[in-house]
Amino acid sequence: MKKQYVSLLAVILSVSGFLFSCHDKMNKNTGALQFDSIQVNETAHLFNDTAKPACNIIINFAYPVKSSDEMLKDSLNAYFISVCFGDKYIGEKPEAVVKQYAKNYIDEYRHDQEPMYAEDEKNKESDAVVGAWYSYYKSIESHVQLYEIDLLVYRVDYNEYTGGAHGMYMSTFLNMDLTLMRPLRLDDIFVGDFQEALTDLIWNQLMADNKVTTHEALEDMGYASTGDIAPTENFYLSKEGITFYYNIYDITPYSMGPVKVTIPYSMMEHLLGSNPILGDLKD
């Protein structure tokens, strides 16, 4: 399976284009948002035969259903739909998106796997069993991790298996600025040439978390073996600080799992800008 990446910049650009085609004003209201979720758990067998392998798709999609600001609600739904299901669903109703996405997944599974499965069945030895690699699954589960004043942190967890030694999983975060109706990027939070200094802080925090004192010791443990340790746009804000979230293979091998590095605000004061959202979190 190919690793699934979500580009925050691509999400911002695609959704912004949709939103500004609908409305050219930004409302500063944080929205009094209320949320619900749409849940799907469907299993579909090859050839509709329960004796044959199947795919399973699980969706738990959290989304705003009520707000004092309809444009804010629509904006958030566009971003959430984009990051969970892809740009082509932007502008559709959440219920229709989830239903269509699940249907497309099942249809594609059968279209791709049934011919190969039939060929394997035809060519197998009389007592052989066609491999379990035809049993696929996919889950997309999202929730609101934090909603406070002008900030909403939205988390999406993906998990997928398409044959092979193991499945793939990853988590993606959107830190929504509700006044601007778009996700925050590192450039919105930090000032100046922050990259090098922030990289040093991440290394130092990783060393502290792992009770070692050198970069080499971290590298011996497996850190930085699959990618450079540097600030990532996949982060989330909390009252404790900023957490940089590295999915499997970003900086470590699969066996080490994802890596979270939380830097307290007090350690980054010299790098932080004057974004009011940070002030609200630190109060």
Language-model regions: role of each:
Residues 22-283:
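Compositionally biased intrinsically disordered regions enriched in Thr/Gly
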